[in-house]
């Protein structure tokens, strides 16, 4: 990799640089990569049973700060879907996702690309996805080559090999180093109405190419779940669809270990989802032993609440843990209300990492109870699926079954309601475009399915036909015809010209999806009904000078008492970060300097949690030697306990001739924490000791600047440690001695 393209942790990824010399780029590797198990991994104080090799660079979970900032990685590959319509902005999001543990980046195609009869070129903007083109794929794979070096783990790049141009896309993906793809002819037939004969013939070619490139294949059975009227009734059919594509792929020549079943828990609360979904997950994994499981998250039963979606997805993760998942796919919790935003891709990755690591070693302690309802339901599901397959055979095969509307029927098989999706064998897009090859047909290319009369030219090259032309594009990338742009207006260069100010200056704007899109999210509670709250919220946002305001979530707290509203809008301005007045980070003294100062002049403090407050953990961590508190530096601490009246704390300071008062206050109702701080200061003034004593106050809801306004010397907020308090005590005492 060129030196000037190496990423630096504290520098933004240069998308403009990525786009340079794409005509000369070739992928550094092919094939899918699985995570490497790290048996009995020791990280911090813990040993992990189901973890993989850690990353070299990553962003740990927020609570990792309590455990030495460790960032253990679960064993399943973690998927995130990134496709905003502008691939150039997605590259930046891919870097963020990789730092949060994603190693499978899936790019959804723009709406309608399934029906394009050939490849498209250039970089047009997409709708509901990204136009998949050679330039776009090459740029993103090139960026991922850099990103995977930065984080220290291979990243799998993935899109879709389906639609009318499936084989064309498969060849391009193999040429460009794409590592995985969806490929399932049933998707074409049922959901895109592409002729079934054409779809299966094309699938033979596509799967052969994917097998050559060692791509992982994900099937399309999960679409039946998303399409069905009542998803929990489609489980037998899901198993049939998995079976058809899996055995078909195996027969074409794919490795079993690269064939992944796209399985999704069919339901979500308030349905009894574990009771319904777990037996299905168990049955599927038992029937398809040896195949890979790509565990998807439920999208059918999602509304606009990100909290609700996250809980559903954690339940999905529990099923993955109780059964098996080789790839754990994630769904952004905002998918029910908008095209996914940057932050929600990251939230989804963190949800998967947090849940799976939290359940590390779980199966060493629990096992599924096979006697009773679980075992009975598993057997029943298998029986229903087998009967479904037998009926397909009786009907004359898959094509006839599709014509008769067997699939995505709302009945729970063997019940049928007659409302399934029906397609005609000789109908659909691409009908009549399949022809038998002539006897002298020959294609001098690698990974070509079916009859190929190479023998007529060179019998020795039957298994290596591309040698007839000194290699095809799969072996000789220089033969690839690279097309840059076709549309002079709808392309990445025009879009990036519009936003270059935000890459080449100190100007900044909020964004959620595209660079400098200006979108912000507001959450508010309004004490009124849902309908009134929605329009009141819009008016509030307009008075805040937001533009293009749209309510994206409404949740009733109580019909009369109030509604939670979430809305988005655009800020019509940017700011210059060079004009910001940013106070310097507080200086922290070295431990040696603190100890030396206190050894020369001993320091005594009194400490307590004040008011009617029983919280003590935070204050004890700041004080106790075992937590790295101020005792370790030689500070003499007199701890008075919790719920201590402020008068008692000040009196104790006088009685003990203390140098400082430390007060902890967690409860913040009606600003009682700040009122207590002000009262401590006032009492110290009244009793004539304020100029002789230091006062520091802290708590999770404390803002240091606001605390100082109450008259105390320092405030300590969330995340403050003993060394921060010790630094304050030493520095403040020096100032007092010097009369500052």
From Swiss-Prot:
Describe the protein's quaternary organization and the partners it interacts with. Heterotetramer of 2 alpha (OraS) and 2 beta (OraE) subunits.
Dependence of activity on temperature: Optimum temperature is 37 degrees Celsius for native enzyme. Displays half-maximal activity at 23 degrees Celsius and 49 degrees Celsius. Rapidly inactivated at temperatures above 45 degrees Celsius. Loses more than 35% and 30% of its activity when stored at -20 degrees Celsius for 1 month and at 4 degrees Celsius for 48 hours, respectively.
Give residue numbers for the modification (N6-(pyridoxal phosphate)lysine): 626
Cofactor(s) for this UniProt protein: adenosylcob(III)alamin; pyridoxal 5'-phosphate
- Under which EC number(s) is this enzyme classified? 5.4.3.5
Q: Does the keyword Isomerase apply?
A: yes
Full protein name: D-ornithine 4,5-aminomutase subunit beta
* Domain spans labelled B12-binding: 602-739
* Pfam short name (any one): Lys-AminoMut_A
Provide the catalytic activity annotation. D-ornithine = (2R,4S)-2,4-diaminopentanoate
Q: What is this protein's function?
A: OraE may be the catalytic subunit. Active only on D-ornithine and 2,4-diaminopentanoic acid but not active on L-ornithine, L-beta-lysine, L-alpha-lysine or D-alpha-lysine.
Keywords for the protein's UniProt record, in alphabetical order:
Cobalamin, Cobalt, Isomerase, Metal-binding, Pyridoxal phosphate
Q: How is its activity regulated?
A: Increased activity in the presence of dithiothreitol (DTT) in vitro. Inhibited by 1 mM potassium phosphate and potassium chloride. Inhibited by L-alpha-ornithine, D,L-alpha-lysine, L-beta-lysine (50%-60%), L-alpha-lysine (26%) and by delta-amino-n-valeric acid to a lesser extent. Significant decrease in activity is observed in the presence of 0.2 mM p-chloromercuribenzoate, N-ethylmaleimide and also by 2 mM iodoacetate to a lesser extent but not inhibited by arsenite.
Tell me which residues bind substrate.
Answer: 81, 160, 182, 294-296
Query: Which organism does this record belong to?
Result: Acetoanaerobium sticklandii (strain ATCC 12662 / DSM 519 / JCM 1433 / CCUG 9281 / NCIMB 10654 / HF)
């Amino acid at each position: 990799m060129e030196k000037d393209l190496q990423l630096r942790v504290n520098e933004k990824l240069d998308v403009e640089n990525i786009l340079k010399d794409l005509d000369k780029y070739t992928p550094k590797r092919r094939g899918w990569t699985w995570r490497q198990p790290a048996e009995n991994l020791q990280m911090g104080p813990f040993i992990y049973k189901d973890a993989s090799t850690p990353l070299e660079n990553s962003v740990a979970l927020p609570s990792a700060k309590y455990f030495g900032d460790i960032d253990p990685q679960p064993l399943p590959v973690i998927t995130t879907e990134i496709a905003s319509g502008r691939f150039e902005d997605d590259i930046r999001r891919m870097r963020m996702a990789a730092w949060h543990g994603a190693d499978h980046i899936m790019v959804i195609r723009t709406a309608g690309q399934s029906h394009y009869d050939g490849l498209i070129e250039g970089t047009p903007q997409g709708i509901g996805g990204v136009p998949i083109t050679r330039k776009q794929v090459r740029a993103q794979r090139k960026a991922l080559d850099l990103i995977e070096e930065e984080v220290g783990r291979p990243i799998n790049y993935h899109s879709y090999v389906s639609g009318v141009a499936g084989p064309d896309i498969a060849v391009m993906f193999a040429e460009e180093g794409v590592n995985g793809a969806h490929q399932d002819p049933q998707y074409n037939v049922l959901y895109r109405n592409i002729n079934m004969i054409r779809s299966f013939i094309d699938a033979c070619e596509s799967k052969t190419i994917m097998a050559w490139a060692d791509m992982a294949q994900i099937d399309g059975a999960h679409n039946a779940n998303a399409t069905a009227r009542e998803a929990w009734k489609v489980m037998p059919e899901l198993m049939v669809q998995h079976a058809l594509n899996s055995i078909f792929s195996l027969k074409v020549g794919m490795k079993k270990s690269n064939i992944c079943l796209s399985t999704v828990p069919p339901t979500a609360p308030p349905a009894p989802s574990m009771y319904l979904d777990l037996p299905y997950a168990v049955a599927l994994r038992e029937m398809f032993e040896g195949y890979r499981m790509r565990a998807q998250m439920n999208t059918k039963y999602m509304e606009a609440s990100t909290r609700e979606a996250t809980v559903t997805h954690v339940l999905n993760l529990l099923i993955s843990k109780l059964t098996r998942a080789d790839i754990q796919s994630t769904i952004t919790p905002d998918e029910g209300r908008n095209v996914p935003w940057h932050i929600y891709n990251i939230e989804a990755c963190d949800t998967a990492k947090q849940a799976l690591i939290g359940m590390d070693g779980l199966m060493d302690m629990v096992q599924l109870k096979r006697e009773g309802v679980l075992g009975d339901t598993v057997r029943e599901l298998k029986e229903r699926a087998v009967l479904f397959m037998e009926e397909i055979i009786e009907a004359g095969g898959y094509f006839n079954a599709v014509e008769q509307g067997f699939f995505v029927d709302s009945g729970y098989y063997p019940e049928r309601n007659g409302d399934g999706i029906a397609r005609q064998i000789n109908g659909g897009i691409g009908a009549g475009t399949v022809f038998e090859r002539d006897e002298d047909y020959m294609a001098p290319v690698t990974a070509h399915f079916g009859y190929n009369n190479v023998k007529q030219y060179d019998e020795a090259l039957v298994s290596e036909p591309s040698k007839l032309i000194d290699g095809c594009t799969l072996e000789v990338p220089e033969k690839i015809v690279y097309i840059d742009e076709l549309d002079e207006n709808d392309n990445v260069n025009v879009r990036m010209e519009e936003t270059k100010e935000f890459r080449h200056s100190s100007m900044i704007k909020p964004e959620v999806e595209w660079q400098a899109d200006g979108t912000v999210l507001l959450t508010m509670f309004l004490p009124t009904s849902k309908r009134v709250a929605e329009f009141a919220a819009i008016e509030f946002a307009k008075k805040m000078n937001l533009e293009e305001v749209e309510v994206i979530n409404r949740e009733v707290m109580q019909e009369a008492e109030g509604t939670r509203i979430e809305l988005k809008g655009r800020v019509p301005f940017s700011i210059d970060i060079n004009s910001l007045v940013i106070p310097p980070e507080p200086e922290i003294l070295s431990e040696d300097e603190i100890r030396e100062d206190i050894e020369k002049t001993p320091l005594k403090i009194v400490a307590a949690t004040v008011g009617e407050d029983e919280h003590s953990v935070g204050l004890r961590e700041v004080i106790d030697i075992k937590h790295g508190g101020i005792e370790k530096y030689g500070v003499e601490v007199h701890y008075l306990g919790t719920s201590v009246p402020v008068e008692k704390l000040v009196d104790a300071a006088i009685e003990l001739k203390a140098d400082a008062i430390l007060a902890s206050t967690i409860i913040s109702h009606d600003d009682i924490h700040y009122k207590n701080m002000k009262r401590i200061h006032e009492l110290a003034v009244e009793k004539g000791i304020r100029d002789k004593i230091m006062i520091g106050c802290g708590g999770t809801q404390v803002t240091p600047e606001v605390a100082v306004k109450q008259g105390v010397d320092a405030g300590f907020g969330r995340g403050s440690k003993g060394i921060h308090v010790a630094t304050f005590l030493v520095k403040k005492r020096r100032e007092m001695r010097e009369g500052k």
